[in-house]
Regions:
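Sec-dependent N-terminal signal peptides of Gram-positive bacterial secreted proteins and lipoproteins
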Residues: 2-22
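Polar/charged alpha-helical tracts
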Residues: 3, 23-25, 48, 168, ...
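Generic "edge-of-domain/loop-turn" microfeature
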Residues: 15-16, 40, 66, 133
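Active-site beta->alpha N-cap acidic-glycine motif
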Residues: 23-97, 101-123
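Catalytic domains of cell-wall/extracellular-matrix polysaccharide-remodeling enzymes
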Residues: 90-181
Length: 181
């Protein structure tokens, strides 16, 4: 199911910029595929589909998941996908309470990636667990000053919140999320 669902989503992404170009003469709409919280057990299938369709993507990995599935994290890096930190443990509450914790967590993530995946690994990409709006400016300043650029999202497939009965249902949900964006 993931392969068909992803293929439908990729086709949607390919169509969105064209539709946007018809209505917008100065700006081009762009869709970036990003995947959070991995690697997971379905990562190999996802990578295969992305490769077959020649689609770029960015993966925001969690250090504990990297430890659980180091081979999948290696596959992501070796395939040339952009990789960012989604922290070591996805500890939303801890980061909100202790601004400096985010820096320690980012360092732990990068150390884990170097130990488990590639000894030369380094990234300046970051995604806050739960999105950046949940965090105070002090945390954001620390992240920026440490050399990271953070990225949020404006559309979600809903796969983390809902169980869809079909690929079409997930695609329809995602399309509704893109309206006006």
């Amino acid at each position: 199911m993931i392969k068909r669902g992803l293929a439908l989503l990729v086709l949607l992404c390919m169509a969105l910029p064209c539709a946007g170009m018809a209505e917008q003469t100065e700006a081009r709409r762009v869709v970036y595929l990003t995947f959070d919280d991995g690697p997971k057990k379905d990562t190999p299938e996802l990578l295969e589909t992305l490769s077959e369709l020649d689609v770029p993507a960015t993966f925001f990995l969690v250090g504990l998941s990297v430890r659980a599935f180091p081979e999948y994290a290696k596959q992501i890096v070796q395939a040339g996908y952009a990789v960012g930190s989604h922290t070591m443990a996805h500890s939303i509450g801890r980061i909100q309470k202790d601004a400096e914790f985010v820096l320690r967590d980012l360092a732990r993530f990068e150390k884990t990636m170097r130990e488990e995946v590639d000894e030369t690994f380094s990234t300046d990409l970051f995604r806050f667990p739960g999105g950046s709006t949940a965090y105070k400016s002090r945390v954001k300043t620390l992240v920026r000053d440490a050399g990271y650029a953070w990225f949020d999202w404006n559309t979600m497939t809903g796969d983390a919140q809902y169980t869809f009965s079909s690929d079409q249902e997930m695609l329809d949900y995602t399309l509704r999320q893109t309206e006006g964006k």
